[in-house]
Amino acid sequence: MSYRSKQASISRFFKSTKSNNSAKNEPAVQHIPKKTGVMLKFSYNNKENVVEGGKDTEGPHIVGSHVELPGQSVNSVVNSDSIVVNSNLEIDPKISSVLKRKPDIDIQLKTTKKRSKTLTPLEKQIRELRESHKDKVLVIQIGYKYKMFGDDAKLGSKILDIMYIRGGDDGTRDEFSYCSFPDFKLHINLKRLLTHGLKIGVVKQLESAIVKTVEKSSKSSDLMKREITGVYTRGTYMGDEYVQSSGNSADTESPYYIICINEINQKELSMVAVQPKTGDIVQDTFKDGLNRDELETRLMYLNPSEVIVLSSEQPSVETLKTIRLVASDVQLLPRKRKGEDEVFNGLIEFFDSIDNGKYKHLGDYFSVNFSKHIQSCFYELINYLSEFKLSNVFTIPDNISNFTNSRKYMVLPNNTLYALEIFQNYTNPASQKGTLIWLLNHTRTRFGNRLLNKWVSKPLIEKEKIEERLLAIEDLTGDFNNVVDALKIQLDKMGKSLDLEELLMKTHYAATYNLDKINRRDIYNMLDCFQSVLESMNRFEKGITEFSKTKKSPLLTNILLELSEMSKTTVVSNLLNKINRSYVMNESKDPEEQVTQFFNLDNHNWEDIRSEFSELDKIEKLFEEELLNIRRVLKRPQLQYITNNKEPYLIEVRNGKQVDELPTDFHRINGTTTVSRFRSERTAQLYIKKQYHKEKLLVNCNVAFNDFLKEIDEQYEFFSKIVKNLSVFDCLLSLTAASLASKNTRPILVDQQLIEVQKGRNPIIESLHNRNDYVPNDIDICYDNKVLIITGPNMGGKSSYVKQVALLVIMSQIGCYIPCDRATLGVFDSIFIRMGASDNILKGNSTFMNEMLECSNIIHGISNKSLVILDEIGRGTGTSDGIALAYSILRYLIESPLRPLVLFITHYPSLHVLEDSFPTVVTNYHMGFQQIHKDDNDFPEIIFLYNLVKGVINNSYGLNVAKLAGLPVSVISGAHRVSESLKYKVEIQQKEQFTMKFGSILQMLKKDEINSNNILELENLFSYI
């Protein structure tokens, strides 16, 4: 009995009494879900396992509802003791005797008998594949399943929570232990594996059994050809490339960057980052200190999944520590830097080789426009991405941008991002609620969402560009406009499910490397979406012209005019005319039919596809002729072919006499207790021939589809321009929505460095809490009032106030209205914030060291257009040293010729003397409060007013915070007594010091011994008084 016959015999013994099949008492052979409780229990290597149905063709695997091992009879696995069947299933009586008789090969699964060490052809193939790709976890297609072997299987079974089946016990079989899953779950499981930082290689069967049989390219017993068709990491995975789309082409995860860092020396680094999903490329060269704050800022922005570090010998410890600190789960790849000649020649050779020299000119472009250090990064990334077939991302130079551009935008440092919680809520990292991006993000599309993140992270510093966005918001908040509304509708139709930017990049990769990187329905949806946008703009051509004349915003007008101009072309319509829309849109069609019926053959001549359709039509006619012949032979003029269990062209006859009278060349395919189904010899031959031509048709359709992708990719620049305009429009709509969310006001921008705000509100706190309860505050920082020293009780609102100032500045320079009654603002080129207390164990820094390093970076980074916010400088060390450092740092900023605007929060009231020394620059403020004295309390209770008041206070009222925190009354009372005692001692010491100072100066005055030193002491005494 053949392998296939044995498989059919065992499968047929399952028969469901609840079957809905038309034939009475017909056994149901099907994959049974877990919930039905149908299981097959077996023991393998002293381990009991329960498995479910599936179907494979080679290797140790599960077939139907049984387990099959290579070299064993199917009957040896199935016996009456190893079947556990649900009550709604019964065993076919016809084969019950097969289950009871002794197996053909008597093998017990619990045996300790050693197998032969001779490897099967499949095992040899698996070993060769794994030996050739030791750096990857391999997922190998075998029949209708994907399997992982050896150590890969141990890892996979644990991550995927699937059964791990051990190999034999001959000492060499552990490498063939495996776990498996159905082929349709490939991309579901790939995503789960990739989240653990693995590098996955997908090995696919590249041959069809029917094509091999018909063309006789090899013996039928030969193995299927298997090769790696895709390699993936978390940053290079592009989504469900091989799976027919369900209408949601977008992944919910944010795309990752892959970064190459080139350590030029200890203080200078170059960097190139690429985001394969979107094609975004960022490059930068920057100076950095040993603390690597600049590198940390870039890593926080880019969120890398893989980081390549180039160096002459070994990467510096400082760089490696910083990478691990910011991205603990990143894949770190140290590399030795290549020589300049190798890099130059490598870039030239790469661009020459892509797409038959189409991008040859880019070799010179990269060598001329980028430094040697940046070129090294490009070359290393090209080599790295080549394995993933993504290196052609560098053939689109328009996607390359600078990380920093001091003339266009500011880059918020990592401390500022952290302190203001721009992108991440550090109280609840799982949610963005409470962040600035959460407040501003009302985008409709995924590509708009990505652009808004860039806008928020890099506020503009060109007044004219900020005004352009503010004018656009003003126009969008005006009267209803048909053109604007039509474009809004187009964005809403795309939503977050259709990512045009990602689909364009998938098309680019697939067109260059002939890969299944994108499915047909997504291509149609993408083109249809572009067409819908352009048709909409074409309909409102007159309205767009009128809009451009009546509205103020050049930014909004340019978007509409450019889209209107593009709508006059036939680029998209010509491509869409080649698609058979009815088949693409009908989701009920078979996936195979979606491939073969994708093109509209009436509008384009695909000769190879036409010829295969012609052959299939001929075969269908031959089937009909054979049916007429069978009718005559069987004397059944109404006889029709039937399809059963996906087996077509079957002749069904009743068991008994009708079966006995069939010609000898009729082959039984399947049956029940009452009927049997056959194919005639001629029908069987035609069926094989039809399968062959269907396979050839699929191949030809895939070739034609790849040519079609190349046509689309030729228009990449055209489509990319549409996406960029739509993304800017989406961001403007988002900022408009944020501006209208509360009583926001358009800021007035001026050339002077000042912040004058009437009744300003912290936008985050206001959004999270009841707006009616919020206490607004004025802000007045200008040339004559550049430094604000802010004191006040703990929890009085000092930090919220200074954060409010920074957030209002950032919002205004993003181009958004801000929450206040009126605002006049200068344009800042940097915002530095030192706030909070934390150590950094990974970098080996204490809390105070971190504080001082951050202060050092601020002092060295300020300009005359900087906003500096310092919170409680000096608290990480002793009081005297803390006060001294806080005083010196603040005085340095005051006296600096750059003279930035400074907000300085402190609990050191003695710093108020700086207002006396610099009355035209420094002003003391405190957060308002009220004291309530009660008879039963040793100390007053505090009511916070949360308003900014001029003046200084000498008490932080920490005991009130302790009370709010729930410390025992006895502890707080004890602390109050100690506090009062310390205050008394300090006052006594101060009086004694004053008496001594005053007495000595009085003696000098009596003796008339006044000199410059005495005068200085006298000034100090008066200041002290």
UniProtKB/Swiss-Prot annotation:
Bias type Polar residues, positions = 1-24
Region Disordered: start-end pairs: 1-28
Q: Does the keyword Lyase apply?
A: no
| Any single GO BP term | mitotic recombination
Family annotation (SUPFAM superfamilies): DNA repair protein MutS, domain I, DNA repair protein MutS, domain III, P-loop containing nucleoside triphosphate hydrolases
Its main subcellular localisation, reduced to a broad class, is nucleus
Q: Where in the cell is it found?
A: Nucleus
Briefly, what is this protein's role?
Component of the post-replicative DNA mismatch repair system (MMR). Heterodimerizes with MSH2 to form MutS beta, which binds to DNA mismatches thereby initiating DNA repair. MSH3 provides substrate-binding and substrate specificity to the complex. When bound, the MutS beta heterodimer bends the DNA helix and shields approximately 20 base pairs. Acts mainly to repair insertion-deletion loops (IDLs) from 2 to 13 nucleotides in size, but can also repair base-base and single insertion-deletion mismatches that occur during replication.
Mind telling me what this protein is named? DNA mismatch repair protein MSH3
Species of the source: Scheffersomyces stipitis (strain ATCC 58785 / CBS 6054 / NBRC 10063 / NRRL Y-11545)
